[in-house]
Design a protein with these regions (language model features):
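C-terminal flanking tails of non-heme Fe-dependent oxygenases
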Residues: 1-67, 72, 120-316
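Non-heme Fe(II)/2-oxoglutarate
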Residues: 7-10, 18-22, 72-129, 135
Length: 316
């Protein structure tokens, strides 16, 4: 437990082996991802994210923003399959995030492949979260109440196309992840980098491992004892593509992130969550998630959340 806590606090990233997911299962989800990206563009655009108020679906390269700059990657976002929530006066805007995924008609095997991976990754993440609770001298079930009944998991399949040096190598810009934990499956091509002691450190792929990093919810819950680490992805050179499958384990949208009562020796090292004036953190999970989605996908925001944009503009 000490090693887990130290890795999470000092770096915020670590490799996980012995996770229980088999190599054939890894190969299957990677094959499904490659199969999707090989589809004709028209098939992918038929499920473009802009059609989904839940921010689910396909985004072409350059279609997502990180800190206002375009990310050079194409991707498919999916979440937990649930019915939409009826809207009306007094219903929080973040309830619009709940709903169905979009799936390509041309690739019917993709849905069971990705939902199956989501289930496997969820099992791993829950075991890890319980271990983190114990490492912080908390009950094993310390977080159960805020994710148990309707967790808000999200995952992507991502392709980073190679390109010639242009002066902009942003595959995805520097950022922190917003959930509890991220479990990343990556192919053999490097590109992920973690900010550590003011420098960017490569997170090279290691076969049969997942890369785990701390999200902002754990940073909030531990009052900053555990840190969500800034990371980015650098675009591969021309002629090379990089495939990854990130899974974001989070809480119920209606949950409020608790502040853990840490033991004295840990509390003394908890300096509060890192503050970014351009990206404030909220303890209400739904508010946090919606804020992040609106910033990253302005086209979806304009189509499905124009009322919120108008209110924000009027208040500014």
């Amino acid at each position: 437990m000490f090693d887990l806590r130290t890795a999470a606090r000092d770096v915020g990233f670590f490799y996980l082996s012995g996770h229980g997911i088999t190599q054939p299962e890894i190969d299957a989800v990677m094959g499904a991802a490659r199969g999707f990206f090989a589809l004709p563009e028209a098939d992918k655009l038929a499920i473009e994210m802009v059609k989904s108020p839940q921010f689910r679906g396909y985004t072409r390269a350059g279609g997502e923003l990180t800190r206002g700059r375009a990310d050079w990657r194409e991707q498919l976002d999916i979440g937990v399959e649930r019915a939409t929530i009826a809207q009306g006066p007094g219903v929080p805007a973040w309830t619009r995030l709940q709903g169905p995924n979009q799936w390509p008609a041309a690739l019917p095997d993709l849905k069971p492949a990705l939902l199956g991976w989501q289930a496997k990754a969820t099992d791993v993440a829950i075991r890890l979260l319980k271990a983190f609770a114990l490492s912080l001298d908390q009950p094993e079930d310390a977080f159960d109440a805020i994710y148990r009944s309707e967790p808000n998991h999200r995952m992507k399949i991502v392709r980073y196309p190679g390109r010639d040096t242009t002066g902009d190598d942003q595959g995805v810009g520097a950022h922190k992840d917003g959930g509890f934990l991220t479990l990343l499956l990556q192919d053999e091509n490097k590109g992920l980098q973690v900010e550590y002691d003011g420098s960017w450190v490569d997170v090279d792929p290691i076969p049969q491992t997942l890369v785990v990093n701390i999200g902002e919810l754990l940073e909030l819950a531990s009052n900053g004892y555990l840190r969500a680490t800034v990371h980015r992805v650098v675009t591969p050179p021309a002629g090379i593509e990089r495939i990854s499958v990130p899974f974001f384990f989070s809480a119920r949208l209606d949950a409020t992130v608790p502040l853990l009562d840490l033991p004295e020796e840990l509390a003394a090292e908890a300096r509060g969550p890192a503050s970014d004036p351009d990206n404030p953190l909220f303890r209400n999970v739904g508010t946090n998630v919606l804020k992040s989605r609106l910033r990253s996908h302005p086209d979806v925001a304009r189509r499905h959340y124009a009322d919120l944009l108008e209110k924000a503009s009027a208040a500014s």
